[in-house]
Amino acid sequence: MSWQDKINAALDARRAADALRRRYPVAQGAGRWLVADDRQYLNFSSNDYLGLSHHPQIIRAWKLGAEQFGVGSGGSGHVSGYSVAHQVLEEELAEWLGYSRALLFISGFAANQAVIAAMMAKEDRIVADRLSHASLLEAASLSPSPLRRFAHNDVTHLARLLASPCPGQQLVVTEGVFSMDGDSAPLEEIQQVTQQHDGWLMVDDAHGTGVIGEQGRGSCWLQKVKPELLVVTFGKGFGVSGAAVLCSNTVADYLLQFARHLIYSTSMPPAQAQALRASLAVIRSDEGDARREKLVSLIARFRAGVQDLPFTLADSCSAIQPLIVGDNSRALQLAEKLRQQGCWVTAIRPPTVPAGTARLRLTLTAAHEMQDIDRLLEVLHGND
């Protein structure tokens, strides 16, 4: 089989399963409205949970940062790309979340890959929730450490896996809020079991940070858990992009030596770090509290109005509200019908989610209004 035959076969298989991914160029993709092809849609696909991507205070901080520092960092943080803007942001993040150190990364994917690659060796073992994000599971699969998966949020299964002999160290990996189902991990129980077996816990809280907990401190703070490794990302609650790893001083020093994604990548622009500082200030403020409270109200309105639809509503209290349709083609058809009626919704299909669980992944944000939720419910009820 030639290279072209191999590529064509893979694409044909995706098409046959109604699982071929496509991109849509949009003029605006974050916030309340999505604009594409000169048409405006209510946007129920964005991860901009607090509606901060268009916040004037954050935009102004980025502009001023660009004027002060330029539009790029100029290099890796190990060469010339670590600015005072990066340093101050790291210090503010560490203070906010109660850690000794924070290290910035260009994306959550890079942060997860870097940490697992740097921390794990052949004699160690990774034990991950089976529904963990692709960045975590791919990093674990590429690691020299064996990977064991425990049933989703099943602490008893986790304990059994941890109890089996391991010559090295054990790292338990999970998410705070799961990206495709919107449910939360029982972090307190997971940490307790992990500690009983002398393991370390790594939590990716991409979808909880900024959105839940006191001052938006996220899932771990809400559940009174402090994992050894906490990954937070800035493309969701913060409304920007990038990520950080929160850890101890010793672990931070170690990652600075061995985390290749950090060492060999150009740092995020200092102007972006300034925008993230402004976003953090909003998240921690009374305005941040008001946005989170509004989001909770919108979620409650949606869940109350969708109960009688002939789809499975995931057990989620988060901004992620999946409607499980099951069949790939049915999910695609529903998403298209909703778009035709002014609601931009994304159909998520295998391999992103397990086979037979294709869904409409609906995301609500503080930028929405109650009438937007009512319109979404009206359209959903008209297409059931």
Curated annotation (Swiss-Prot):
Keywords: Biotin biosynthesis, Pyridoxal phosphate, Transferase. Substrate binds at R21, H133, T352. Its cofactor is pyridoxal 5'-phosphate. CDD domains: KBL_like. GO terms for biological process: biotin biosynthetic process. It holds the Pfam family Aminotran_1_2. SUPFAM superfamilies: PLP-dependent transferases (SSF53383). Pyridoxal 5'-phosphate binds at G108, F109, S179, H207, T233. The modification N6-(pyridoxal phosphate)lysine is found at K236. InterPro entries: Aminotrans_II_pyridoxalP_BS, Aminotransferase_I/II_large, AON_synthase_class-II, AONS_Archaea/Proteobacteria, AONS_Proteobacteria, PyrdxlP-dep_Trfase, PyrdxlP-dep_Trfase_major, PyrdxlP-dep_Trfase_small. Homodimer. HAMAP family: BioF_aminotrans_2. Belongs to the class-II pyridoxal-phosphate-dependent aminotransferase family. BioF subfamily. This is 8-amino-7-oxononanoate synthase. The lineage of its organism: Bacteria, Pseudomonadati, Pseudomonadota, Gammaproteobacteria, Enterobacterales. The gene is bioF.
